Every structure is written in C-alpha cells, then in structure tokens.
C-alpha cells in the first residue's frame, strides 16, 4: 500500500525549516546506509541526534500521532526518529531496499522497518529531478509531492531517488514498526476501517456497524504483535 498524507506542515513552517537547513552543517549520507545501500547512496544528511533534525522529527511525529489516516494505515508500534537529508548537484540514491532492522543511535531498542516514510520539505518547483521511485505490486510509482506532504509505503519495496539536477531537495524520512507486520493484512484493516468510518457517517444507527467493528477488532487482535 502506497499512501499520500498531505499538509503536515504549513507554508510558514516550511519556509523557516528550509531557511534553517540552508545554514546547517551536513554530513555524508552514507553514514546511515547499509553496506550494499552505501554503494548507491549519494546525498547529504544531518547527523543522527542533530538538534535541528530532532526538532523537525519531534514536530513531525507529534502531528502524525494526531493524523487518523496515518494511525489507521500504519498501526504504529515503534518509530525510528526521523532523519533529514538533502539532494543537490546530481545527488541521488540508486535502487535499494531498506535494512530490515534499525537501531537509533544511543538506544537499545531496535525498530523493524515495516513501513518507510518520506516527508517532502522543498517546493517541487524549486528543484528538478528528485522523484522518489517505488516499485510495488502495481508497477513503478514516481512520487514528487508538495512541500509538507508525506508518502507512506512498505519497507519491503525496491526504491530509489532520481538525481537532482537543479536546486536542492530537502526531506525527512523514517521507518515505522507496525503492530501488524504483513502489508496485505494492514491494507485489509485500513480498508475495513475506512468503510466503518464512512458507514458511521452515512448510516450511524445501522445494526451491522457493531458487528463490522467487532470483526475489525477481532482481526487486529489475531494479527497484532505487541
């Protein structure tokens, strides 16, 4: 399942974020890549634990926890603290699959990367290239969203970032360990939850709503890992 979550940051917030990122001290993005991925990764990244990355990441996670669409689709259990990257001057990241497990710096906790997320921070008109290209069961998807919008997709997906040939592309990215590790099961629960919400709005007193809601929770109880 590939999901677009719009409007997590407004224009004024994004302007302040990008202004701060322009003044930031960047490191080589290969630092957080696995052995195979490092060969394909050509970008810049704020170091893990960088104050600006923590500030942006904290604001992002706080908003996602209040976004029903994300909560329903991801069913989050653990979240790897968001990282911030920059692509410019031909920077790109060739096709790769993210490492299955991630361990935040200084933490004993490991996060299984069931879901990957990218939050676009730069106006798409301000740079050329930089599309996030995702291969899924429906073919190849090219994603280049408005600033402040986020895409959520399975961590098992082969994906890449096309070269940025003009301007610079700032983004936040992170991984989520879901309560339900299987993507097809998560998708089924997400679709069922959407149907329940729509029926609740259309026919709030229908007796089958109670049964359908019970079925949702029984499936979640069967598949969830806590």
Swiss-Prot record:
<keyword id="KW-0408">Iron</keyword>
<dbReference type="Pfam" id="PF18331">
    <property type="entry name" value="PKHD_C"/>
</dbReference>
<dbReference type="GO" id="GO:0016706">
    <property type="term" value="F:2-oxoglutarate-dependent dioxygenase activity"/>
</dbReference>
<feature type="binding site">
    <location>
        <position position="98"/>
    </location>
    <ligand>
        <name>Fe cation</name>
    </ligand>
</feature>
<dbReference type="Pfam" id="PF13640">
    <property type="entry name" value="2OG-FeII_Oxy_3"/>
</dbReference>
<keyword id="KW-0847">Vitamin C</keyword>
<dbReference type="GO" id="GO:0006974">
    <property type="term" value="P:DNA damage response"/>
</dbReference>
<protein>
    <recommendedName>
        <fullName>PKHD-type hydroxylase Pput_0892</fullName>
        <ecNumber>1.14.11.-</ecNumber>
    </recommendedName>
</protein>
<dbReference type="GO" id="GO:0005506">
    <property type="term" value="F:iron ion binding"/>
</dbReference>
<dbReference type="InterPro" id="IPR006620">
    <property type="entry name" value="Pro_4_hyd_alph"/>
</dbReference>
<feature type="binding site">
    <location>
        <position position="169"/>
    </location>
    <ligand>
        <name>2-oxoglutarate</name>
    </ligand>
</feature>
<feature type="domain" description="Fe2OG dioxygenase">
    <location>
        <begin position="78"/>
        <end position="178"/>
    </location>
</feature>
<feature type="binding site">
    <location>
        <position position="96"/>
    </location>
    <ligand>
        <name>Fe cation</name>
    </ligand>
</feature>
<keyword id="KW-0479">Metal-binding</keyword>
<dbReference type="InterPro" id="IPR044862">
    <property type="entry name" value="Pro_4_hyd_alph_FE2OG_OXY"/>
</dbReference>
<dbReference type="GO" id="GO:0031418">
    <property type="term" value="F:L-ascorbic acid binding"/>
</dbReference>
<feature type="binding site">
    <location>
        <position position="159"/>
    </location>
    <ligand>
        <name>Fe cation</name>
    </ligand>
</feature>
<dbReference type="InterPro" id="IPR023550">
    <property type="entry name" value="PKHD_hydroxylase"/>
</dbReference>
<dbReference type="InterPro" id="IPR041097">
    <property type="entry name" value="PKHD_C"/>
</dbReference>
<keyword id="KW-0560">Oxidoreductase</keyword>
<dbReference type="GO" id="GO:0006879">
    <property type="term" value="P:intracellular iron ion homeostasis"/>
</dbReference>
<dbReference type="InterPro" id="IPR005123">
    <property type="entry name" value="Oxoglu/Fe-dep_dioxygenase_dom"/>
</dbReference>
<keyword id="KW-0223">Dioxygenase</keyword>
């Amino acid at each position: 399942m590939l999901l677009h979550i719009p409007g997590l940051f407004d224009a004024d917030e994004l302007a302040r974020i990008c202004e701060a990122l322009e003044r930031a001290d960047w490191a080589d993005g290969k630092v957080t890549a696995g052995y195979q991925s490092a060969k394909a990764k050509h970008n810049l990244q704020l170091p893990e634990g960088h104050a600006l990355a923590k500030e942006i990441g904290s604001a992002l996670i706080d908003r996602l926890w209040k976004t029903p669409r994300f909560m329903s689709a991801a069913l989050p259990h653990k979240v790897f603290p968001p990282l911030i990257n920059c692509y410019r001057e031909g920077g790109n990241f060739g096709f790769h699959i993210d490492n299955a497990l991630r361990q935040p710096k200084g933490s004993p906790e490991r996060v299984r990367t069931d879901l990957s997320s990218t939050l676009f921070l730069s106006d798409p008109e301000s740079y050329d290239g930089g599309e996030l290209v995702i291969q899924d069961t429906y073919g190849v998807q090219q994603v280049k969203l408005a600033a402040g919008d986020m895409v959520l997709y399975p961590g098992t997906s082969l994906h890449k970032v096309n070269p940025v040939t003009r301007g610079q592309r700032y983004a936040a990215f992170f991984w989520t360990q879901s309560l339900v590790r299987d993507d097809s099961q998560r998708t089924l629960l997400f679709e069922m939850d959407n149907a329940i919400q729509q029926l609740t709005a259309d026919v709030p007193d229908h007796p089958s709503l109670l049964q359908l809601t019970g079925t949702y929770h029984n499936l979640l109880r069967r598949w969830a890992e806590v």
